[in-house]
Regions:
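Secretory/organelle targeting and membrane-embedding segments
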Residues: 1-141, 145-486
Length: 486
């Protein structure tokens, strides 16, 4: 097995390499998941001697891994590390990479592309022309794949000329989270849940992906992307699909992907006539988070410019099918919000009739909260009687399943799981090209409608939960946002 992270940046390695990829690979080493002769070859523009590269990786692990680094595992891991200088924007030098990989022709090769999406197609072509794509070769593409439907299709076509669809792994690390995987078990392994998982019992669904950090060093990249493209098109629509999809015939990747594609194609288009009623677009200004003053988005760009890129989005999405008709999915995501939290809230309908006296209190509708971060788990609010004599006093209490409390053994994080799935040739946790293109088709409708109605990003103060129009979005429907766990 050979893992080749190909970086396109001038400095050689993307932030994802340092924060996610390298720690994930090292954890696999700690768990003895690599064969003895496996190699990890990092390719970048930098002319980096091997000993300097090994020291660079060690520094990255010390910075991004909690606790001490296992000395024995590090010794094995360091032996696997190699660096190759390659400018992925150049037509030359690829034969040298072929020489570096010589002797591994019968091994699984994983090409992990951490670069601008516009380079995915040309890089795949260069790999093929240099004879690097052997029978066991797989390619990993980071999100977002493209900037819109047309660019996504072009990238998929270009990469598809070299790699079979079954060997293309479009990675979305949210799909590797244990709680996301547990959505399948929660829905389809519990007879208590599935009969209620429909419009008759569920009032609405909320999906929140909130960050308290700003764009920071990624501001230049983010200004070309925005929250709608960066978060909604992939992470949030994938979560929506897992909540809304019908039961697949099996856990085979073709069955799972097929059901998700049906959901994406059933999303009601957002048009210029509806866009102001069902979407909110915001951009953070300066404010305070955890008692510290933080700059606004335009200040972080490092130059005076009137950027209209959104850093916050709220959307009322509707799935037009029999299961979910008239049951809205409210999505919100943004940067510089009041806390870091990702969760799905399934709000059930109130009981049809209360048998309790007024002084007992009104029974609160049940609510299921599926937490993705910071503490992965599932919480179900149930109405119970407060202990004591006299009349009934009702109170909602949570039944809480916290994975960290229940399972004391460390389980692989999202990137670790996904990398091992790539090596095992298991594509169920990755996106098919039809998913990517169907998602872009819906997202493009929002972008075009924003432009048609000249709907600009409205300012919100850092450290809040986004623009106040997001509150009004639900208030118009007689609903309100649930307070996220932070």
């Amino acid at each position: 097995m050979v893992v080749v992270p190909l970086g396109g940046g001038e400095q050689g390695f993307a932030a994802t390499d340092l924060r996610k990829l390298l720690p994930a690979l090292f954890h696999r080493e700690v768990d003895c998941q690599f064969s003895t002769d496996s190699r990890i070859i990092a390719s970048s523009r930098k002319d980096l001697p091997r000993e300097d590269f090994v020291a660079f990786v060690r520094q990255a692990l010390e910075e991004h891994l909690p606790g001490d680094i296992d000395a024995e595992a590090w010794g094995r891991f360091a032996e696997r590390l190699h660096h190759h200088r390659q400018d992925v924007t150049s037509d030359t030098g690829w034969d040298s990479l072929h020489d570096t990989l010589s002797g591994d022709d019968d091994r699984i090769r994983v090409f992990y592309l951490a670069m601008l999406p516009s380079l995915y197609g040309p890089t795949a072509t260069h790999l093929a022309q240099a004879g690097l794509v052997n029978e066991g070769a797989r390619i990993v593409l980071e999100k977002p794949v493209g900037q819109d439907f047309d660019s996504a299709r072009r990238i998929n076509d270009e990469v598809g000329e070299v790699f079979e669809e079954s060997n293309i792994y479009r990675i979305d690390h949210y799909l590797g989270k244990e709680t996301v995987q547990n959505l399948m078990a929660l829905r389809f392994a519990n007879s208590l849940v599935e009969p209620l998982w429909r419009r008759g019992a569920i009032d609405h669904v909320q999906i929140t992906v909130a960050e308290n950090l700003g764009a920071g060093e990624r501001a230049a990249f983010y200004d070309r992307t925005g929250t709608l493209r960066d978060m909604v098109q992939n992470h949030m629509l994938q979560l929506l699909c897992l909540v809304a999809m019908e039961a697949p015939a099996s856990l085979d990747h073709r069955d799972i992907r097929g059901e998700k594609i049906k959901v994406l194609r059933a999303l009601r288009p957002i048009t210029p006539d509806s866009v102001r009623q069902v979407t909110v677009r915001g951009q953070y200004t300066s404010g305070a988070i955890d008692g510290k003053v933080v700059p606004g988005y335009r200040e972080e760009l490092g130059e005076e410019r009137d950027s209209e890129t959104e850093t916050f989005v709220a959307i009322k999405a509707e799935v037009d099918n029999w299961r979910w008709a008239d049951t809205p999915f409210y999505l919100r995501s943004g940067k510089r919000l009041a806390g870091k939290s990702s969760e799905i809230v399934v709000q059930f309908r109130p009981i049809a009739h209360s048998i309790f006296r007024a002084e007992s209190g009104v029974p609160e509708p049940n609510r299921m909260t599926i937490r993705l971060q910071p503490d992965e788990g599932v919480e179900l609010s149930m109405v119970t009687k407060v202990p004591g004599p006299g009349h009934f006093k009702l109170r909602a209490l949570p039944l809480n399943l916290s994975f960290s409390d229940t399972y004391d053994k460390r389980y692989p994080d999202a990137y670790e799981r996904l990398l091992m799935e790539v090596l095992l040739g298991a594509p169920a946790l990755f996106m098919h090209r039809d998913e990517v293109e169907s998602a872009w088709n819906w997202i493009d409708g929002i972008i075009d409608s924003w432009a048609a109605r000249e709907m600009t990003a409205q300012p919100y103060v850092s450290g809040t939960w986004g623009h106040t129009d997001a509150v009004r979005l639900l208030d118009r429907d007689g609903r309100e946002w649930c307070q996220p766990h932070v």
